[in-house]
Amino acid sequence: MKEKLALALLSFFLGLGSFFSFYVAPTLFKVLERQQAGAVVEKVFPVYFGLGIILVGISLFLGRDSGKLFLSLGILNLLLLLLQEFIVIPKLHGLKATNYELFLKYHGVSMGINLAILLLTLGKVLILIFKR
């Protein structure tokens, strides 16, 4: 039962993250001015990563008996979410107004971390699916 709930939480986060990262964010930048789209994304990302911290944290607790690989991926996933929420996103926010060139570099790093978060989440989902 605990693993099914962990699977549901991780699947929800994976779907949410994929939808936002690969559809919503790019669409915002296509239909809105860059500044407007950036303002929207700037408000959404802390909620997205905060929710990820909660869901991944709960799933890590619920799936603690799912093996070392699940735990390792879960801990790394949680650390990357914390990094995004409390270090990278605030740094990006500050750089956007002061050093746009450096902002773009950090933005690339942030995108890579987000992709890693989604891939780690997918890995944990697959572990739980195939563990059955």
Curated annotation (Swiss-Prot):
Disulphide linkage map: none
Membrane topology (UniProt): Multi-pass membrane protein
Alphabetical UniProt keywords: Cell membrane, Membrane, Transmembrane, Transmembrane helix
Domain of life: Bacteria
Parts forming coiled coils: none
Principal localisation: membrane
Location within or outside the cell: Cell membrane
Transmembrane segments: 7-29, 44-62, 69-88, 108-130
Keyword Lipoprotein recorded: no
GO cellular component: plasma membrane
Presence of the UniProt keyword Isomerase in the record: no
Protein name: Uncharacterized protein aq_125
Organism: Aquifex aeolicus (strain VF5)
